[in-house]
Amino acid sequence: MSDKEYKKLLKQYHKLSDRHILVVETDMPYPDVLKVVALSDKIRKAGNELVSLMRKNYDQLMRTKKYRKLLKLYGNTEDKDKLKALANQLNDMQKSYNVTWDFCRTSMIPIGKKYGIDAVFALTKAEDIWRGMEKCLYDNGKITHFSKYGELPCIRAKQINRGIPMFVEDGKLRFKLRKMQFGIHVNDRFQSDEVNAVLSYLENPDKMDADAVNTLIEEACCIDTYRPCYATLVPRLIRGKYRVYLHLTIEGKAKPKYDRFGNPRHKYGKGMIGADIGTQTVAYTSDTEVGLKNLSERGNNIQTSERKERLYYRAMDRSRRATNPQNYNPDGTIKKGKKTWKYSNHYKKLKAKHAELCRINAVNRQLAINEDANDLRSLGDTFVTEPKNASKLMKRAKKTTVNSKGKFNKKKRFGKSIKNRCPSGFQTTVEKKFKVTGGAYIEVSNNYRASQYDHTADDYIKKKLSDRLYRLRDGTLVQRDWYSSFLLYCYDYRTQDIDKDKCITDFGRCYDKEKALIAWIKANHIKILNSGIKVA
């Protein structure tokens, strides 16, 4: 094999191989931490300057009737030759209005020099901004947003030998940022295994790469080399103090986790799992267990924390109104136009408390989601659910409706529930968990209609959204979400529809478990949101 062919195959392996991120805290002294925070703020300002420039060009482009007409024609055309011609015209217009990656990249060079940012960090920030512009140009994005004061963007170098280079010293990983040198805190067995794997690769990288290329040629699969790809520094404000975390992107799948006795921490089950994921709850049915629980709930204090968030926010609003009465109309609405705002010390303290509480709640939500995903993976290896629809449910209603009393109905829908419970985040985590661990993740089509089918009548019967507990045609009382999960559990691979024979044979066994579950929920006074189960 020639050197050119080897490099080509190695590049192909890098494209096909998996990636994962190791998150560890750095051991920087606090003065160095503040320097990292200052650099992060400079990157934020430089990014905002580039966002302003790209937004201006994008707005000018979208104002032209010709471009809007071409977009409409492109969306309505099916002929490939016409699509190609329209795409070329759209690209030409984007070039003429400087809405291109090349313009974005070259514009960032003088901005980066102005703020004294390394070229590699400036280029990475430009890539992030262009990714946002691409969402506006080719996806459902509306506008690119500025980073607020206090938000600290990550400091990322897309190459391991530039920006934040890595080296080995006394058998430990060390990193460098400008004149600062620092290491990392390795706190547990998983982090230790990951670091040892990276060190093992760095001892003989050429041999590991050669083994990976040979395996790709002979077996057409990718092995885990644990090559360090690049490092990212992420500053965070935790309990009033800044801390810097290192995100090391590593080639290959993550190492398995073990408990203190050396046993695998997570067990992987076998069998089918049907799950109905709502805005606030998840109901599931498996071969061994049925369940109905609130999403993103870790302990009993989640609802108390959510209420505290609201109370802090209201207190901040009262303080803001008291110190800035000139910015409000007599009816309490905010005046239009440019305004100056003054914030009291009391407001600043409340804001810090609110931010810290939001951070803690976000961490707890993420931990709860991971725990629930691991529990589901221990029950089976095939996960069947409906497609995600949280983004649609989050939006306000378009139609203005009037109730029986002649008052306008509120247009708000499920935005607050989705923010607090993260159903899409949970579904994405479950999807990754099952796919990475050798399981299967299946999303049924929209005509599956698990919430409408009644297996006792063999018919689809529409129900009101408020009917959380209802009776089947034969008189059996079922909980709506659980019954939907049962119908998803009865998924047929061949027809990709409900297996009616399985519904009949397995319903009695699963229904007994559902009755026992509801009795347990009532006995333990557990409040399941929007379930219809009344707890005394």
Predicted features and spans:
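Gly/serine-rich nucleotide phosphate-binding loop at the start of the catalytic core
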Residues: 1-123
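Catalytic micro-motifs at enzyme active sites that drive phosphoryl/nucleotidyl and oxygen chemistry
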Residues: 12, 230-236, 254-264
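Generic detection of short hydrophobic beta-strand segments and adjacent strand-loop junctions
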Residues: 16-30, 182-197, 293-295
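Short amphipathic alpha-helical coiled-coil/interface segments
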Residues: 43, 90, 126-133, 350, ...
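Stable alpha-helical structural segments in soluble proteins, enriched in small hydrophobic residues
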Residues: 50, 124-136, 482-492
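Amphipathic alpha-helical surface "interface" segments used
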Residues: 66-76, 145-163, 507-523, 527
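Acidic carboxylate diad motif detector
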Residues: 77-240, 415-416, 420
